[in-house]
């Protein structure tokens, strides 16, 4: 009887699970409008609450809203909203927990007038202990950002690129400032009369006109996402007294000056000094990455004092509790490599001090992660290395074989102890005041990201937020299958297979090979809307980490130096072969796509094999030489190529997809951001498109106005949706036979001849024959 009862209970549970699954729906591309993201978590000094930025989609304005929320670390209550602005970011608790400073960008009433800038972000103060409205306490012409409280709570340091000329112009436009200036000006002598005669403008009628002409003198003059760089406005460190009420008339003071920007900064424990890093080189393109550490007196200002030099590019810097040491992450400069693992370093703040590498024997990436398409699209914040209260340990995230977890590093022994574990990606972390506990933002393949509280025991963390649970409880999502396979040379390659939620191994499915960019990056155990939606549309998605990927060790990452693309292509094809062996993929219905380096490899794939029925290359590269001349960073050092294209043109020709354009018969879609300065369309998709149109091959170009290289991750919401629709629509047409009127004008593919009728006139060296 008991056995029958147990069996009946099991049947009921199974039936309930089937019923619950039947109530769920498939994910759609438009679900992004309901997504919420968490960014920049900050733990209160008493460890009781976490302030964070909640990012949501404003579908009416096709943009993102950011507001500051908080949640208890007890995990027993829902988050509550703290600020009411549309663009509030960078929350920072005062040392006593009574105040919260944050950055607010005013809502623009429309496009700025010619010659003017949009409203600048300013610092605001929110009384937490007493409640009440926030108030603005900076008003700099070019705004303020990156606030940081002094440990004694009296001052707030921040960054601004406002310069004296900006302040003078602001005073000129402000009637109150002009009146104050007149009141303070020296009075005329009784024997002197003011000159009232009209005077012509100093330089003619256009004296006040601001030219929009750019005069370029530096190698790097624009950056993806940031636009054209203004070297006349270096970023400097300012301080302001922390106001106690909206009536306090506090005056910001500029601490650093000159033509060089300051990078990361940190307060000394006694609140007397601010330490910062800077690279005082006119054009860093010619130099190996490096930085100097300076200190400036916070109250008195004066000339900064140079403390030490670092012959690397430090990031995530953090001062020790006693203020005598500096911890940071950096990659060594030499030998010059395509990829060098970042390590964790510590050094004394003293002249001639040398950094010590704590992770020299740890063959994985420190201060690194894995990539999906749902990182916080705005106000994500950054991480710094965390010190233990006794100064004996450091904490940072490491990336290991597609996983990203928080680790503890013992400074004396270099022993490494996991703080978090599992198939996941820790995307942000913050410590309590004593570093006994950590608030971590964790993403998994079925969760965009939530806050958890973890302690140093390594036990399972406690979930604090459920920011997308209402939506995700309605969705039928599937977990990816992890696989390892052998490539052509016996090297093990790591990959994942995302299957449709109603997967049936007895059916035949179309497959999409998705290739990551970088090339030194990694897929992993993290949420990816694109993969989940492709699976929901009936595709099997294969996403591998071929050689050159991060999180698998130095040798695996750098093995493609001077050979990219090359053997990584073979890794990808071996992955497709591996999935075909499983029997549930139709070999005649294969698609391939990828972005950035993945777009380059997509172009390479269709120039070297005809096995794919369709391809979509995103933010791609067609010609390495053209990219060398136009990208937003330089390859002056011998990292990817041994020489510039005018000294060794053949190497660039051999490795450029455009060289093999006559081999391309696969229908190709090109996805381009018109403001992409990382892989400019003129060096990529535009070349592929024009060449294939000349050859009358099936090709289409989809252009996104105003979008940068980050289209898929942080572009305008509707553009992100349309991007997905076009990619999947292209595959629907060629892999599933669906009618797509928007692509009717595309020249249909012709049968591929048994042997290429028109091979390249001059076959490049090392060119590989098509399969």
Q: What name fits each language-model region?
A:
Residues 35-50, 85-103, 133-135, 139-157, ...:
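Conserved beta-propeller blade repeats
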Residues 56-60, 106-111, 163-166, 281-284, ...:
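Short glycine/acidic-enriched loop and turn motifs that connect beta-strands
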Residues 65-66, 110-121, 161-247, 277, ...:
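Predominantly five- to eight-bladed beta-propeller fold
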Residues 73-76, 128-131, 242-246, 297-301, ...:
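Short loop/turn segments that connect beta-strands within beta-propeller blades
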Residues 93-179:
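Hydrophobic or amphipathic alpha-helical targeting/insertion segments
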Residues 530, 536-537, 543-771:
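Active-site-proximal cap/loop segments of hydrolase catalytic domains
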């Amino acid at each position: 009887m008991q056995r029958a009862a147990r069996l009946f209970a099991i049947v009921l549970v199974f039936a309930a699970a089937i019923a619950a699954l039947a109530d769920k729906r498939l994910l759609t591309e438009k679900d992004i409008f309901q997504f919420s993201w968490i960014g920049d978590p900050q733990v209160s000094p008493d460890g009781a609450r976490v302030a964070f930025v909640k990012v949501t989609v404003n579908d009416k304005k096709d943009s993102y809203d950011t507001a500051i929320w908080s949640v208890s670390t007890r995990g027993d209550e829902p988050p509550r909203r703290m600020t009411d602005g549309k663009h509030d970011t960078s929350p920072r608790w005062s040392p006593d927990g009574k105040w919260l400073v944050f950055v607010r960008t005013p809502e623009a009433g429309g496009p700025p007038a010619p010659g003017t800038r949009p409203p600048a972000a300013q610092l605001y103060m929110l009384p937490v202990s007493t409640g009440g409205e926030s108030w603005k306490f900076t008003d700099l012409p070019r705004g303020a950002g990156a606030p940081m409280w002094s440990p004694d709570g009296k001052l707030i340091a921040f960054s601004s690129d406002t310069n004296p000329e900006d302040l003078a112009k602001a005073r000129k436009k402000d009637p109150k400032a002009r009146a104050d200036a007149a009141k303070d000006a020296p009075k005329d002598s009784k024997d002197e009369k003011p000159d009232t005669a009209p005077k012509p403008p100093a330089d003619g009628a256009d004296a006040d006109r601001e030219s929009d002409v750019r005069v370029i003198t530096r190698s790097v003059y624009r950056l993806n996402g940031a636009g054209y760089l203004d070297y006349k406005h270096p970023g400097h460190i300012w301080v302001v007294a922390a106001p106690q009420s909206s009536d306090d008339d506090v005056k910001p003071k500029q601490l650093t000056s000159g033509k060089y920007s300051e990078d990361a900064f940190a307060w000394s424990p006694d609140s007397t000094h601010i330490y910062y890093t800077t690279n005082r080189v006119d054009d860093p393109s010619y130099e190996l990455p490096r930085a100097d550490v300076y200190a400036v007196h916070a109250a008195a200002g004066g000339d900064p004092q140079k403390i030490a030099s670092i012959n690397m590019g430090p990031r995530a810097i953090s001062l020790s509790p006693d203020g005598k040491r500096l911890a940071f992450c950096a990659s060594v400069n030499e030998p010059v490599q395509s990829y060098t693992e970042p390590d964790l370093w510590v050094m004394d703040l003293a002249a001639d001090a040398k950094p010590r590498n704590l992770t020299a024997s740890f063959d994985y990436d420190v201060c690194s992660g894995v990539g999906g398409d749902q990182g916080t699209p705005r106000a994500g914040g950054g991480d710094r290395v965390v010190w233990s209260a006794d100064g004996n340990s450091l904490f940072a995230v490491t990336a290991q074989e597609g996983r990203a977890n928080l680790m503890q590093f013992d400074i004396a022994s270099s022993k490494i102890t996991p703080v978090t574990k599992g198939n996941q990606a820790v995307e942000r972390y913050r410590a309590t005041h004593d570093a006994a506990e950590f608030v971590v933002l964790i993403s998994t393949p079925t969760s965009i990201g939530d806050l958890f509280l973890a302690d140093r025991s390594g036990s399972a963390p406690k979930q604090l937020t459920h920011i997308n649970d209402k939506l995700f409880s309605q969705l039928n999502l599937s977990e990816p299958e992890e696989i390892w396979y052998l490539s052509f040379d016996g090297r093990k390659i790591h990959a994942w297979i995302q299957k449709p939620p109603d997967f049936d191994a007895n059916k035949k499915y179309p497959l999409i090979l998705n290739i990551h960019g970088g090339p030194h990056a990694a897929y992993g155990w993290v949420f990816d809307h694109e993969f989940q939606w492709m699976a929901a549309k009936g595709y099997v998605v294969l996403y591998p980490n071929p050689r050159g990927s991060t999180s698998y060790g130095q040798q695996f990452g750098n093995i493609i130096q001077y050979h990219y693309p090359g053997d990584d292509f073979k890794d990808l094809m071996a992955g497709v072969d591996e999935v075909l062996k499983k029997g549930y993929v139709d070999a005649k219905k294969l698609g391939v796509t990828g972005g950035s380096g993945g777009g380059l490899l997509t172009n390479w794939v269709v120039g070297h094999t005809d096995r794919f029925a369709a391809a979509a290359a995103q933010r791609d590269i067609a010609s390495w030489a053209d990219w060398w001349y136009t990208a937003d960073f330089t390859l002056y050092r011998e990292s990817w190529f041994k020489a510039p294209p005018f000294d060794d043109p053949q190497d660039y020709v051999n490795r450029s997809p455009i060289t093999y354009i006559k081999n391309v018969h696969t229908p190709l879609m090109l996805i381009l951001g018109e403001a992409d300065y990382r892989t400019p369309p003129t060096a990529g998709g535009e070349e592929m498109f024009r060449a294939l149109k000349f050859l009358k091959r099936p090709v289409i170009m989809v252009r996104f106005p105003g979008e940068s290289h980050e289209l898929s991750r942080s572009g305008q919401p509707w553009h992100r949706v349309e991007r997905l629709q076009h990619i999947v629509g292209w595959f629907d047409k060629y892999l599933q036979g669906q009618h797509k009127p928007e692509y009717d004008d595309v020249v249909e593919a012709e049968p591929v001849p048994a042997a290429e009728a028109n091979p390249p006139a001059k076959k490049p060296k090392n060119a590989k024959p098509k399969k």
